[in-house]
Amino acid sequence: MLNESEKEQLDQHGFLLLERLISSDTTLQLRERSLTLAAAEQETGASHTYLANDSAQRVWNLVDKGEIFEEAIQQPKMLAAMEYLLGADCTLSSFTVNVLYPGAPDAGLHIDYPLSGLPTPRPSFPLVANSVWFLDDFTLENGATSCVPGSHRRLEALPESGVEYTDELQICGPRGSVLIVNGAIWHGSSENRTNEPRVGLLGFFCRSMLKPQQAHLKLVSDEVVSRATPTLKRLLGFDSLPNMNA
Protein backbone atom coordinates (compact mmCIF):
# COMPACT_ATOMS: atom_id res chain seq x y z
CA MET A 1 0.00 0.00 0.00
CA LEU A 2 3.02 2.28 -0.21
CA ASN A 3 3.71 3.91 -3.56
CA GLU A 4 7.20 4.19 -4.99
CA SER A 5 7.57 7.81 -3.91
CA GLU A 6 6.75 6.90 -0.30
CA LYS A 7 9.21 4.01 -0.36
CA GLU A 8 11.93 6.29 -1.74
CA GLN A 9 11.20 8.84 0.99
CA LEU A 10 11.75 6.18 3.65
CA ASP A 11 14.85 4.81 1.96
CA GLN A 12 16.55 8.14 1.31
CA HIS A 13 15.40 10.34 4.19
CA GLY A 14 14.47 7.82 6.88
CA PHE A 15 10.98 9.16 7.61
CA LEU A 16 7.57 9.48 5.98
CA LEU A 17 4.70 11.73 7.08
CA LEU A 18 1.26 10.32 6.30
CA GLU A 19 -0.95 13.37 6.73
CA ARG A 20 -4.49 13.00 8.11
CA LEU A 21 -4.31 9.20 7.99
CA ILE A 22 -6.67 8.85 10.97
CA SER A 23 -10.21 10.25 10.93
CA SER A 24 -11.04 13.26 13.09
CA ASP A 25 -13.48 11.26 15.23
CA THR A 26 -11.01 8.45 15.88
CA THR A 27 -8.22 10.92 16.61
CA LEU A 28 -10.40 12.68 19.18
CA GLN A 29 -11.39 9.39 20.81
CA LEU A 30 -7.76 8.26 20.97
CA ARG A 31 -6.73 11.57 22.53
CA GLU A 32 -9.47 11.50 25.16
CA ARG A 33 -8.72 7.89 26.09
CA SER A 34 -4.98 8.62 26.24
CA LEU A 35 -5.39 11.55 28.62
CA THR A 36 -7.81 9.56 30.79
CA LEU A 37 -5.26 6.76 31.13
CA ALA A 38 -2.45 9.21 31.87
CA ALA A 39 -4.49 10.93 34.59
CA ALA A 40 -5.51 7.61 36.15
CA GLU A 41 -1.90 6.46 36.42
CA GLN A 42 -0.91 9.76 38.00
CA GLU A 43 -3.66 9.39 40.60
CA THR A 44 -2.50 5.90 41.58
CA GLY A 45 1.17 6.86 41.68
CA ALA A 46 1.94 4.39 38.90
CA SER A 47 2.76 6.89 36.17
CA HIS A 48 5.90 6.61 34.06
CA THR A 49 7.30 10.13 33.75
CA TYR A 50 10.55 11.40 32.30
CA LEU A 51 12.37 14.60 31.29
CA ALA A 52 12.93 17.51 33.70
CA ASN A 53 10.22 18.07 36.34
CA ASP A 54 8.36 14.95 35.17
CA SER A 55 7.18 17.00 32.22
CA ALA A 56 6.60 14.03 29.91
CA GLN A 57 4.64 10.85 30.50
CA ARG A 58 4.27 7.45 28.88
CA VAL A 59 1.39 5.01 29.27
CA TRP A 60 2.44 1.49 28.32
CA ASN A 61 0.73 -1.67 27.09
CA LEU A 62 -2.03 0.09 25.15
CA VAL A 63 -3.23 -3.04 23.39
CA ASP A 64 -4.62 -4.14 26.77
CA LYS A 65 -6.22 -0.76 27.57
CA GLY A 66 -9.08 -0.39 25.12
CA GLU A 67 -10.42 -1.85 21.89
CA ILE A 68 -9.74 1.45 20.16
CA PHE A 69 -6.01 0.78 20.55
CA GLU A 70 -6.36 -2.80 19.32
CA GLU A 71 -7.90 -1.43 16.14
CA ALA A 72 -5.49 1.48 15.79
CA ILE A 73 -2.32 -0.59 15.80
CA GLN A 74 -3.65 -2.55 12.82
CA GLN A 75 -4.09 0.57 10.65
CA PRO A 76 -3.37 -0.78 7.13
CA LYS A 77 -1.26 2.05 5.69
CA MET A 78 0.87 2.31 8.81
CA LEU A 79 1.38 -1.46 8.85
CA ALA A 80 2.32 -1.41 5.18
CA ALA A 81 5.10 1.03 5.98
CA MET A 82 6.33 -1.12 8.86
CA GLU A 83 6.27 -4.26 6.76
CA TYR A 84 8.17 -2.48 4.00
CA LEU A 85 10.90 -1.51 6.47
CA LEU A 86 10.96 -4.58 8.72
CA GLY A 87 9.50 -7.48 6.76
CA ALA A 88 6.04 -9.00 6.49
CA ASP A 89 6.48 -10.84 9.81
CA CYS A 90 7.45 -7.76 11.84
CA THR A 91 6.40 -7.62 15.50
CA LEU A 92 4.96 -4.93 17.73
CA SER A 93 7.67 -3.96 20.21
CA SER A 94 5.57 -1.55 22.29
CA PHE A 95 2.54 0.72 21.97
CA THR A 96 2.42 3.74 24.27
CA VAL A 97 0.81 7.09 24.92
CA ASN A 98 3.37 9.90 24.91
CA VAL A 99 2.35 13.22 26.49
CA LEU A 100 4.54 16.32 26.53
CA TYR A 101 3.20 18.67 29.18
CA PRO A 102 3.71 22.45 29.03
CA GLY A 103 7.35 23.26 29.63
CA ALA A 104 8.69 19.87 28.57
CA PRO A 105 12.24 20.48 27.33
CA ASP A 106 13.86 19.33 24.12
CA ALA A 107 14.57 15.62 24.59
CA GLY A 108 17.65 15.63 22.40
CA LEU A 109 18.40 13.49 19.38
CA HIS A 110 18.81 9.73 19.73
CA ILE A 111 18.44 6.48 17.84
CA ASP A 112 16.02 3.84 19.03
CA TYR A 113 16.51 0.78 21.22
CA PRO A 114 18.53 -1.41 20.78
CA LEU A 115 20.58 0.31 18.07
CA SER A 116 22.77 2.51 20.24
CA GLY A 117 24.13 -0.57 22.00
CA LEU A 118 25.18 -2.37 18.83
CA PRO A 119 28.81 -2.50 17.65
CA THR A 120 29.66 -0.29 14.70
CA PRO A 121 29.18 -0.19 11.84
CA ARG A 122 25.53 -0.81 12.59
CA PRO A 123 23.45 -2.77 10.05
CA SER A 124 22.55 -0.83 6.92
CA PHE A 125 19.02 -2.29 6.87
CA PRO A 126 16.27 -1.27 9.33
CA LEU A 127 15.92 -3.28 12.53
CA VAL A 128 13.30 -1.15 14.30
CA ALA A 129 10.88 1.60 13.30
CA ASN A 130 8.45 3.90 15.07
CA SER A 131 5.05 5.30 14.18
CA VAL A 132 4.33 8.65 15.82
CA TRP A 133 0.61 9.37 15.94
CA PHE A 134 -0.34 13.05 16.03
CA LEU A 135 -3.34 13.31 18.36
CA ASP A 136 -2.80 17.07 18.36
CA ASP A 137 -1.44 19.31 15.65
CA PHE A 138 2.35 18.96 15.92
CA THR A 139 3.85 22.44 15.65
CA LEU A 140 7.13 24.29 16.10
CA GLU A 141 5.82 25.47 19.47
CA ASN A 142 4.43 22.32 21.09
CA GLY A 143 7.17 19.73 20.67
CA ALA A 144 7.06 18.44 17.11
CA THR A 145 9.47 15.60 16.39
CA SER A 146 12.92 16.73 15.27
CA CYS A 147 15.11 14.64 12.98
CA VAL A 148 18.20 14.76 10.80
CA PRO A 149 17.16 13.50 7.34
CA GLY A 150 19.35 10.72 6.00
CA SER A 151 21.12 10.15 9.31
CA HIS A 152 19.99 6.49 9.33
CA ARG A 153 22.80 5.92 6.84
CA ARG A 154 25.47 7.14 9.31
CA LEU A 155 26.32 3.67 10.53
CA GLU A 156 29.11 4.59 12.94
CA ALA A 157 28.23 8.04 14.28
CA LEU A 158 25.77 8.91 17.05
CA PRO A 159 24.19 12.32 17.70
CA GLU A 160 26.13 14.39 20.22
CA SER A 161 24.32 15.94 23.17
CA GLY A 162 23.88 19.70 22.92
CA VAL A 163 25.02 19.93 19.31
CA GLU A 164 22.79 21.80 16.85
CA TYR A 165 22.92 20.16 13.44
CA THR A 166 22.41 22.44 10.46
CA ASP A 167 20.33 19.81 8.65
CA GLU A 168 18.02 19.12 11.61
CA LEU A 169 14.34 19.86 11.02
CA GLN A 170 11.05 19.64 12.90
CA ILE A 171 8.29 17.58 11.32
CA CYS A 172 5.02 19.44 11.79
CA GLY A 173 1.61 18.24 10.72
CA PRO A 174 -2.12 18.23 11.46
CA ARG A 175 -3.75 16.00 14.05
CA GLY A 176 -4.61 12.60 12.64
CA SER A 177 -1.28 12.31 10.85
CA VAL A 178 1.15 9.44 11.43
CA LEU A 179 4.91 9.85 11.11
CA ILE A 180 6.88 6.73 10.16
CA VAL A 181 10.46 6.85 11.42
CA ASN A 182 13.32 4.45 10.72
CA GLY A 183 14.67 3.75 14.22
CA ALA A 184 18.21 4.52 13.07
CA ILE A 185 17.46 8.12 12.09
CA TRP A 186 18.55 10.75 14.63
CA HIS A 187 15.31 12.02 16.12
CA GLY A 188 13.62 13.28 19.29
CA SER A 189 10.82 15.45 20.62
CA SER A 190 11.37 19.20 20.85
CA GLU A 191 10.34 21.68 23.55
CA ASN A 192 6.68 22.27 24.35
CA ARG A 193 6.47 26.04 24.75
CA THR A 194 2.66 26.15 24.85
CA ASN A 195 0.19 25.99 27.73
CA GLU A 196 -1.39 22.75 26.53
CA PRO A 197 -0.23 19.12 26.57
CA ARG A 198 0.90 17.69 23.26
CA VAL A 199 -0.50 14.20 22.97
CA GLY A 200 0.73 11.42 20.72
CA LEU A 201 1.02 7.67 20.44
CA LEU A 202 4.16 5.68 19.72
CA GLY A 203 3.66 2.40 17.88
CA PHE A 204 7.14 0.86 17.93
CA PHE A 205 7.93 -2.19 15.77
CA CYS A 206 10.88 -4.55 15.34
CA ARG A 207 12.00 -7.36 13.10
CA SER A 208 10.72 -10.74 14.22
CA MET A 209 14.21 -11.88 15.22
CA LEU A 210 14.45 -9.19 17.92
CA LYS A 211 13.05 -9.21 21.45
CA PRO A 212 10.20 -6.69 21.83
CA GLN A 213 10.31 -4.00 24.51
CA GLN A 214 7.19 -5.46 26.12
CA ALA A 215 6.30 -9.11 26.81
CA HIS A 216 2.90 -9.03 25.16
CA LEU A 217 2.23 -12.73 25.79
CA LYS A 218 2.30 -12.03 29.53
CA LEU A 219 0.77 -8.55 29.55
CA VAL A 220 -2.23 -8.91 27.26
CA SER A 221 -5.40 -10.30 28.82
CA ASP A 222 -7.17 -13.46 27.71
CA GLU A 223 -10.15 -11.30 26.74
CA VAL A 224 -8.05 -9.34 24.24
CA VAL A 225 -6.46 -12.52 22.88
CA SER A 226 -9.86 -14.18 22.42
CA ARG A 227 -11.08 -11.45 20.08
CA ALA A 228 -7.75 -10.67 18.41
CA THR A 229 -7.55 -10.83 14.64
CA PRO A 230 -4.85 -12.98 13.01
CA THR A 231 -2.96 -9.75 12.27
CA LEU A 232 -3.03 -8.62 15.89
CA LYS A 233 -2.00 -12.07 17.14
CA ARG A 234 0.96 -12.00 14.80
CA LEU A 235 1.96 -8.50 15.92
CA LEU A 236 1.80 -9.59 19.57
CA GLY A 237 4.02 -12.60 18.95
CA PHE A 238 1.52 -15.44 19.14
CA ASP A 239 2.81 -16.56 15.76
CA SER A 240 6.15 -17.34 17.38
CA LEU A 241 7.94 -18.74 14.37
CA PRO A 242 9.11 -16.09 11.89
CA ASN A 243 8.03 -16.35 8.28
CA MET A 244 11.12 -17.80 6.63
CA ASN A 245 9.86 -16.60 3.25
CA ALA A 246 9.33 -12.95 4.34
Predicted regions and their residues:
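A structural signal for short, well-ordered beta-strand segments
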Residues: 94-97, 131-133, 201-205
